[in-house]
Amino acid sequence: MPRVKRGVQARARHKKVLKQAKGYYGARSRVYRVAFQAVTKAGQYAYRDRRAKKRQFRQLWIARINAASRQNGLSYSRFINGLKKASIEIDRKILADIAVFDKAAFAVLVEKAKAAL
């Protein structure tokens, strides 16, 4: 059985990790062992934060809707309840956009929610 030297594969693997660690500070971008740890941890953070981002945006939308609905004399929970009773199905992302960019249309929605309560 011939001898197998795995230098080529090791070099390729190291290059791949060091390429991913490009831009990191100090040894994290130069030393394979440290770079591998940094890249692995970065991947864990990225995985976690892709999920956290969804929660954070929903919080932001709710805060914006709450602020806008309170300016029109209705709390967030009563506003959402009123929309459900009026069978108006608009998701929070779109409601937040309307609240920020089209205050008149949002005021109409608030009035419809008030009427349905």
UniProtKB/Swiss-Prot annotation:
Q: Which SUPFAM superfamilies match?
A: Ribosomal protein L20
Instruction: Read off the Pfam families from this record.
Output: Ribosomal_L20
Listed InterPro entries: Ribosomal_bL20, RIBOSOMAL_L20_CS, Ribosomal_protein_bL20_C
List the GO biological process terms: ribosomal large subunit assembly; translation
Give the UniProt keywords, A-Z.
Ribonucleoprotein, Ribosomal protein, RNA-binding, rRNA-binding
What job does this protein perform?
Binds directly to 23S ribosomal RNA and is necessary for the in vitro assembly process of the 50S ribosomal subunit. It is not involved in the protein synthesizing functions of that subunit.
Name of the protein = Large ribosomal subunit protein bL20
Query: Coding gene?
Result: rplT
